[in-house]
Amino acid sequence: SQICSTRYPLLLVHGVGFRDLRYFNYWGRIPRELARYGADIYYGNQEAFATVAYNAGDIYRKIQEICRETGCEKVNIIAHSKGGLDSRYAISRLGAAPMVASLTTINTPHRGCRFVDYACRLPEGLYRAIAGVFDLWFSRFGDSHPDFYTATHQFSTRASICFNEEVADAPGVYYQSYASVMRDFLSDPLLWFPYLIIRAVDGKNDGLVTPESAMWGEFKGTIANRKHRGISHGDMIDLKREDYKGFDVTEFYVELVKTLKEKGF
């Protein structure tokens, strides 16, 4: 079956804190399943903890490379978390719009993250010391321009207001978005703490992002899986390579890409 054989190739753009590694795919089992149904897949290869603007440059160059090597006119971007912000910047500020047919954002904090707002209240010296440790760590794993301090501050609700004013949607690009929510703090042991903080001030969330923050363009809905454990930020990219009752993440992406194909993208 070629139900995922879209007119334009797929560009998968990862979120913060990860790289596109050969032996550990950020997207878990998803790319293999998409390829099985005919998808032509590429990766953003941007840095783990660089700023939005820096990563956007990587994405812009990757789009140019794909178009040049394949002869295609455009790409379909599917971006998770911060990757959605990086992609929006590349499209609207760096001139990638003519080469992008669609942008699908998954659990992207378009309107910021309240957990980051609280984290930014840490003493300046302490925050910069923590940032220095992260920068050193990620520089050893391939980042040439890690900037934990700036990158994390770009997730604040205040920064998101400025970002959205400066990075307007590009005419001619189709924007759509998805969100998910955890049932409770036990749904994902990796995200129980930020989940509780955000739950107290903003309500339901995926452990990092609320549905309200994830909405951008045509909002396709919130995946809740209410009768079971809910779906966390990491679950949406098959981080743990686990199957959850009531939600098949690979099937979700197959349907997503199938719909893009049906729209002519």
For each predicted feature, which ranges?
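Cys-dependent protein tyrosine phosphatase-like superfamily
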Residues: 1, 5-8, 101-102, 126, ...
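Active-site catalytic motif of lipid deacylating hydrolases and related acyltransferases
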Residues: 2-75
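Short, conserved loop/helix-junction motifs that constitute active-site signature segments
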Residues: 4-5, 95-98, 167-170
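Hydrophobic/aromatic beta-strand patches that form the interior of the parallel beta-sheet core
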Residues: 11, 42, 104, 176-178, ...
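Short loop/turn segments at strand-loop or loop-helix junctions that form parts
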Residues: 13-16, 46, 106, 180, ...
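Serine-dependent carboxylesterase/thioesterase catalytic core
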Residues: 14, 41, 57-160, 206
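Short aromatic-enriched loop/helix-cap "lid" or pocket-rim segments at secondary-structure transitions
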Residues: 24-25, 113-119, 186-191
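C-terminal catalytic-base region of ester-bond hydrolases, centering on the histidine
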Residues: 165-265
